[in-house]
UniProtKB/Swiss-Prot annotation:
Topology versus the membrane: Multi-pass membrane protein
More about this protein: Present with 238 molecules/cell in log phase SD medium.
Main location: membrane
Name of the molecule in the record: Uncharacterized membrane protein YNL143C
Organism per entry: Saccharomyces cerevisiae (strain ATCC 204508 / S288c) (Baker's yeast)
Amino acid sequence: MREQLKLFTREIVDFTFLILSGFDYYQTLLISSNSSKKRPKDSSLLSEKKKKKKKKKKDVLSYLSYLKDLPFVPFLFWQPGYSQREKNPRQHSLFIMTITKPGMISMADMNYVVSKNRSLNRPAERGGNR
């Protein structure tokens, strides 16, 4: 039973990594299509952005390798809210899905307001039930 759970967990982690890498590739295509508008004039700024992107990718890879050893798998799904052009802070919906046993999935839905430095501040207040 544990071996089946471990194999199932690895398949889910591999699938998640595939989705994340596809999203990263799509973002790279979008950035390269608008590169003339968004390219920083200073080369040091460009290298700093590349370093941050590499560090972020390393963090994702280390997190995914960490997930392979867990008996359960937590997943975080971010749903973007406001655009950056609006004056309101960026709002995300954070979905946490935990697989405890094969076939048993528990999910929590929390809304957070993320400020411009992208740190989690506090749960957003909801007007009513969805």
